Amino acid sequence: MDITDIRIKKVESKNSGSKLLAYVAVTFDNCLVLHNIRVIKGQKGVFIAMPNRRTRVGEYKDIVHPISQDFRKTLQTSIFKEYVRENPADLELELDF
């Protein structure tokens, strides 16, 4: 499955402590779109979080997620490259790609 499009919607937060940087939609093979991937700035750097939902007991469960580490790395690298391309001022972020 090839990534054919990545759309980034940067989140401009008035709260300086906000960790959410952007929402991402990734298109695969021009056939399937995965929405609501989040780019988050954590204590150990920037990472992606997959779409999830809250269960009745308050736990968050991923709706969809990569099965292999290789694909997660490919997806994360592609998203980070597009994020930096669209937001060159954010180059100081600790992006792992």
Swiss-Prot record:
SUPFAM superfamilies: SpoVG-like. It comes from the Bacteria. Pfam families: SpoVG (PF04026). Keywords: Cell cycle, Cell division, Septation. NCBIfam families: PRK13259.1 (NF009749). Belongs to the SpoVG family. This is Putative septation protein SpoVG. It comes from Borreliella afzelii (strain PKo) (Borrelia afzelii). The lineage of its organism: Bacteria, Pseudomonadati, Spirochaetota, Spirochaetia, Spirochaetales. The gene is spoVG.
